[in-house]
């Protein structure tokens, strides 16, 4: 298993897919990393040479990933809450932040529906 940015990449997958296991790296970023490192997208993680691994590591180190990225996202949310913005209030209340309607849906954000006693009459 190749270990990049503190994440063990699955050996049997292609490197372009394996890189997406790192938080903060999606499909397009993974392709850019491999292009800059000069590594083929079709090569499997187990077939990487140590030199190729090091080139990929150098490219990944230039991007904010994993713990640093998670910390920045949580700090951004905390900042929104502290300044009392609408988005911060929605985060604090556990409701959708991006303007979605909540009359019928938003179960993922709001949690499981709670029945109200004697509601039906």
From Swiss-Prot:
Region spans: Disordered: 88-121
Q: Which GO terms describe its molecular function?
A: rRNA binding; structural constituent of ribosome; tRNA binding
> Which keywords appear in this protein's UniProt record, sorted alphabetically?
Ribonucleoprotein, Ribosomal protein, RNA-binding, rRNA-binding, tRNA-binding
Which Cys-Cys disulfides exist here? none
List the GO cellular component terms. cytosol; small ribosomal subunit
State the family it belongs to. Answer: Belongs to the universal ribosomal protein uS13 family.
Purpose: Located at the top of the head of the 30S subunit, it contacts several helices of the 16S rRNA. In the 70S ribosome it contacts the 23S rRNA (bridge B1a) and protein L5 of the 50S subunit (bridge B1b), connecting the 2 subunits; these bridges are implicated in subunit movement. Contacts the tRNAs in the A and P-sites.
Cross-referenced HAMAP family: Ribosomal_uS13 (MF_01315)
On subunit structure and binding partners, the annotation says: Part of the 30S ribosomal subunit. Forms a loose heterodimer with protein S19. Forms two bridges to the 50S subunit in the 70S ribosome.
- Its recorded name reads Small ribosomal subunit protein uS13
The record lists the organism as: Limosilactobacillus reuteri (strain DSM 20016) (Lactobacillus reuteri)
Its gene name is: rpsM
